[in-house]
């Protein structure tokens, strides 16, 4: 079976690796173009999928768009049986969707139709969901609206971070995709339309959302911290040794106590919220590494969180 793989971030890599490892012929990898990196932006960094594909000698394509006739002709010339799409980052025009003999299949990190869109892992945690999952669906022209081929549910534990859920779903996605490809080869892959009820959208994370609002209830603050950990990272400003610093909050837990929002309640860095309190477990000062709260507090007197 001739496969075109389309993906960009680290989340996609285990699925690409599994497809290769199970002997499928990956004739091309499509991924986002290299991005400027470094302090001056003079270096170009290839995506994780780009690097992995090159390790296996797979031709890599990095178009900025697939809307043009020339790019669509190149894609069609690959004569793919199927395209596998996992967090690629570009919309696929109908001409691309129609090109593979068996269609295009997407690995999506939610229980559709909940959390269609760009940031399903973060949004599920930020909303306080108790479960999510991984789904394989056949793509159509809509945004994550195609019929579902396979799904597996995953519990979201109370302190689970987006990073932890990301890694779990990525590995589940690799297993599901291999099973889906096998069923596709055997012509036994059954498709079920998505439910019409329960549709929600996982909008891309806005930078403004990452700043913690201590006037919100503790559960909301906790969900935001774990939903944005490790990236982009929730943050706040702290008065440390009399100066205001910006600090990233990588891990938290629900705490006990109450007070004016932003007040540090004890020597464990429990901070009062609009309702309840949150204990800050892992923090990161600018230019530093993530530290447990007790280590963070060595030589740092925190008087207030802003």
From Swiss-Prot:
The keyword Protein biosynthesis applies. It comes from the Bacteria. Gene3D superfamilies: Formyl transferase, C-terminal domain, Formyl transferase, N-terminal domain. It is an enzyme of class 2 (transferase). Signal peptide: none annotated. GO terms for cellular component: cytosol. It catalyses: L-methionyl-tRNA(fMet) + (6R)-10-formyltetrahydrofolate = N-formyl-L-methionyl-tRNA(fMet) + (6S)-5,6,7,8-tetrahydrofolate + H(+). Its EC number is 2.1.2.9. Keywords: Protein biosynthesis, Transferase. One of its GO terms (molecular function) is methionyl-tRNA formyltransferase activity. It holds the Pfam family Formyl_trans_C. (6S)-5,6,7,8-tetrahydrofolate binds at residues 110-113. Belongs to the Fmt family. Attaches a formyl group to the free amino group of methionyl-tRNA(fMet). The formyl group appears to play a dual role in the initiator identity of N-formylmethionyl-tRNA by promoting its recognition by IF2 and preventing the misappropriation of this tRNA by the elongation apparatus. This is Methionyl-tRNA formyltransferase. The gene is fmt.
């Amino acid at each position: 079976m001739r496969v075109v793989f389309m993906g960009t971030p680290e989340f996609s890599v285990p699925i690409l690796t599994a497809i290769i490892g199970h002997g499928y012929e990956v004739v091309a990898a499509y991924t986002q173009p290299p991005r400027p990196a470094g302090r001056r932006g003079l270096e170009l960094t290839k995506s994780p999928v780009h690097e992995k594909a090159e390790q296996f000698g797979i031709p890599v394509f990095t178009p900025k768009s697939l809307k043009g006739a020339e790019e669509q002709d190149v894609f069609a010339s690959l004569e793919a049986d199927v395209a596998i799409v996992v967090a690629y980052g570009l919309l696929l025009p109908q001409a691309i969707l129609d090109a593979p003999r068996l269609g295009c299949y997407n690995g999506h990190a939610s229980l559709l139709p909940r959390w269609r869109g760009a940031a399903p892992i973060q949004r599920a945690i930020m909303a306080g969901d108790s479960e999510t999952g991984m789904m394989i669906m056949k793509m159509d022209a809509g945004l994550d609206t195609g019929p579902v081929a396979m799904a597996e549910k995953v519990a979201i534990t109370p302190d689970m971070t987006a990073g932890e859920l990301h890694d779990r779903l990525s590995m589940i996605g690799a297993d599901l995709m291999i099973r889906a490809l096998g069923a596709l080869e055997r012509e036994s892959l059954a498709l079920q339309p998505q439910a019409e009820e329960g549709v929600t959208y996982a909008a891309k994370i806005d930078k403004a959302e990452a700043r913690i609002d201590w006037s919100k209830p503790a559960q909301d603050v906790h969900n935001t911290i774990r939903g944005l950990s490790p990236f982009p990272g929730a943050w706040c400003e702290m008065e440390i040794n009399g100066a205001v610093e910006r600090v990233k909050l990588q891990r938290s837990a629900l705490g006990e106590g109450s007070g004016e929002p932003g007040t540090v309640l004890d020597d464990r860095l429990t901070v009062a919220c609009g309702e309840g309190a949150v204990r800050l477990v892992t923090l990161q000062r600018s230019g530093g590494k993530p530290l447990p709260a007790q280590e963070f507090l060595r030589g740092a007197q925190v008087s207030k969180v802003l």
